[in-house]
Amino acid sequence: MEQKFIIHIISIAAMIALMTSCASGKIVLSNDANISKYKYVIFGKETSGDRELDDVVMSVQNQIAETNLTVLSPSNTLKIFECSDSILSPNIHVTSEKWDGGHTYITVTFYDYNTNQSVAVIKSSGIGMTVSHDQSIALNAIRKKINELFK
């Protein structure tokens, strides 16, 4: 009897753990966007949100840099002039609820460097057992969507 009770408790705990860890993500492209024409990315004024989350923002930047996009320095004006019609500039926004079991949301909006028109928006969210777990789940979800779009 006691063994059945323990197995029952373990099964309930496993179901709760599975139900409390959730990720979602999506990509929205502008109607006339030809994402394949973009070969470069310039980081700059790309962040907004809580400065405490700069580590998450840096992780998203690293994920973007690991794609097929080549990172350009804003000071490389000659290369920017040559390639300006194929450069994206991302705005990365991260919010994280400060309690365990809260959400972390990551939104990356890619803008055409020349026109400042939004080309693509990638969103992810994560719900986990702790704040760091939320962030890890959201980062994994955004990584998948970034790779889906640019690799």
Segments predicted by a language model, with ranges:
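Sec-dependent bacterial lipoprotein signal peptides
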Residues: 1-23
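A structural "domain/chain start" motif
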Residues: 5, 20-69
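Residues embedded in well-ordered secondary-structure elements
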Residues: 11, 32, 97-99
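C-terminal/domain-edge helix-coil "capping" segments
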Residues: 23-34, 63-66, 70, 117-151
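A short, hydrophobic beta-strand-centered structural micro-motif
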Residues: 43, 73-99, 106-107
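Solvent-exposed, acidic/flexible segments
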Residues: 49-57, 99-104, 128-139
